[in-house]
Amino acid sequence: MKSESRPSNQFGCSTVKPDRVRMIFASPINPVLESLMFTGIIEECGEVAALKPVETGAELWVNSTFTGEVALGESVANNGACLTVTEVKDGAMRFDLLHETLRLTNLGDLAPGDPVNLERSLRIGDRLSGHFVQGHVDACAEILAYEPVGQDHQFTVALPNEFAHLVVHKGSICVNGISLTVADLQKDRFTLWIIPHTHEVTSLKAATVGSRVNLEFDMLAKHIARITELSKS
């Protein structure tokens, strides 16, 4: 019986086809890579074209410059919430929002003309410049302060008590889809420093005190907290 030879490179090592690479990255052996979809590096600040209430929740239309590059069914994070592209028309993408999505995120607060932070899902080979972000919003929180300090901005956000154990000083947190570092941590709030570039290319340039932002806490912290909780029961 003739055996099938496997392709190899100049070092005599077998090469792996791209589809095999995808299988490896999405295998149960790599749960972190399987769930990793975004990094919190905003690709574009889109603009809300419309938010239409429907029986199942709402239809969100967002103007974007990369509509010609997205396919139906593709995942795009909107203010940090992973949504599915369900239609593309006239330079805008449509996303269907369930009532649960409207309840758990700030997407229902949006109005036509509002900026939205957009990030397409990762492809194998992309640089991981931020931190592991799933696009699963854990909570909404109120902006307590957004003040210019020199060229930067000091950004303070309320910290819901039930999630306080997931935030650490100098740790990563995703705020409205942006990967940021906790600069100061208090019992009921945390503070971030925003550099000029981040201020200019994200929705933070329109940030107002009292408005809500989406929070996604560090994935590893959530898993550790869950393991600790179960070990005590």
Where are these regions (language model features)?
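Conserved loop->alpha-helix
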Residues: 32-233
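Basic polycationic patches enriched in arginine
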Residues: 6, 20-22, 123
